[in-house]
């Protein structure tokens, strides 16, 4: 077996908004986990709240990191965040740098999301359109939770306004301070 993907510390893959580990038969990290493992890496795809603030998701990630460290005996992990998972990973690394060797951000809204800004402007949470969008997102999150076939932990909280604000330019500006 090739050791081309082996790392000193386990890789922890952190999904973005509405992320999952496996939705029925479709893995979020399609092909990536198996390819990295074939290359010799120790890999964990984790689940955090699909719709919540980067800070809440980050605290959930920290709890999972501590479990992974106990399970593997490793001193640290390498975090690999996709989309909002990048902010989640950055939060965990900032709060507990002693547990995190590196953070890789893939398509992370590290300066905010134009889409989140657009939705904030045109679909305010207290408007009829905003309430409808929140309702639809809650339904989507609930359906995804029912169809998730790999996560076996406690039900994760959903906070759509916090999730949305975390991705706006203003929300990320505050996060980056």
Language-model segments: what does each one mean?
Residues 2-41:
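Short, surface-exposed "cap/lid" segments of acyl-processing enzymes
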Residues 25, 53-58:
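Phosphate/oxyanion-binding active-site loops and adjacent basic polyanion-contact surfaces
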Residues 31-52, 104:
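Conserved alpha/beta-hydrolase
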Residues 15, 43, 59-176:
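Serine-dependent carboxylesterase/thioesterase catalytic core
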Residues 1-2, 101:
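Generic signature of intrinsically disordered, low-complexity, basic-rich segments
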Residues 19-20, 51, 111:
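Active-site loop signature of alpha/beta-hydrolase-fold enzymes
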């Amino acid at each position: 077996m090739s050791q081309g993907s082996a790392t000193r510390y386990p890789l922890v893959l952190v999904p973005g908004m509405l992320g999952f580990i496996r939705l029925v038969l479709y893995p979020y990290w399609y092909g990536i986990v198996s390819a990295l493992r074939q290359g010799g890496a120790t890999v964990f795809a984790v689940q955090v709240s699909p719709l919540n603030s980067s800070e809440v998701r980050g605290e959930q990630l920290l709890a999972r990191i501590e479990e992974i460290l106990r399970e593997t005996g490793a001193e640290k992990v390498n975090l690999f965040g996709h989309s909002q998972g990048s902010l989640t990973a950055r939060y965990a690394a900032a709060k507990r740098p002693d547990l995190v060797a590196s953070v890789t951000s893939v398509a992370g809204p590290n300066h905010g999301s134009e889409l989140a800004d657009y939705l904030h402007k045109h679909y305010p949470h207290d408007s009829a359109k905003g309430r409808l969008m929140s309702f639809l997102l809650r339904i989507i999150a609930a359906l995804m939770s029912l169809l998730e076939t790999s996560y076996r932990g406690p039900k994760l909280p959903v906070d759509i306004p916090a999730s949305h604000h975390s991705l706006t330019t203003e929300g990320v500006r505050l996060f980056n301070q």
